[in-house]
């Protein structure tokens, strides 16, 4: 049986192609995650939104 955590990718909203990978508990957080994190390609903090790992 599979675990309760899904691997996800946090994709930069600055359209630089930069992303972070993490996992989330799909039972406790059913919605899409959104974080403000550092994007080294534009050298500033931007919003990262959840996307699937292909």
Swiss-Prot record:
GO terms for cellular component: cytosolic large ribosomal subunit. One of its GO terms (biological process) is translation. Pfam families: Ribosomal_L33. One of its GO terms (molecular function) is structural constituent of ribosome. It comes from the Bacteria. Keywords: Ribonucleoprotein, Ribosomal protein. The keyword Ribonucleoprotein applies. NCBIfam families: PRK00595.1 (NF001860), rpmG_bact (TIGR01023). Belongs to the bacterial ribosomal protein bL33 family. This is Large ribosomal subunit protein bL33. It comes from Xylella fastidiosa (strain Temecula1 / ATCC 700964). The gene is rpmG.
């Amino acid at each position: 049986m599979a675990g309760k955590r899904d691997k996800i990718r946090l994709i930069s909203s600055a359209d630089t192609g930069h992303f972070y990978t993490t996992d989330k508990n799909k039972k406790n957080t059913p919605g899409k995650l959104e974080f403000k994190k550092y994007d080294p390609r534009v050298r500033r903090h931007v919003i990262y939104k959840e996307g699937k790992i292909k």
